[in-house]
Amino acid sequence: MSKSINRVELQGRVGTVRISPCVGAVAANFSLLTEHQLRSASGLAIVESTWHNVAAFEGGDVYLEGLTRGSLVHLTGRLRISKYTAADGTERMFIEVVADTLKVLEENE
């Protein structure tokens, strides 16, 4: 069987943050905004914005101190896809990044 890779690296601004105590650790779920700049066929600058769902558990290389709305963060992790059935009976998917490393950056980093 060939080796597979599930790796994500993101740097962007934090949106909403929910921090909650967990057994033996602190967990954070937050949204992260990344932006990609490109040019249209006519040469106009376009900014493509993407919101990501992130789950992080403090410890190891995950540092949650200073994680607030607007913070600039850099993280690496993996994608996790969960399927569930909504109240109306439709099948839904929830995609999130589970952080292995997370650092709140200073503005000049």
Regions picked out by a protein language model, each given a short descriptive name:
Residues 1-109:
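Single-stranded nucleic acid-binding surfaces, predominantly the OB-fold ssDNA-binding core
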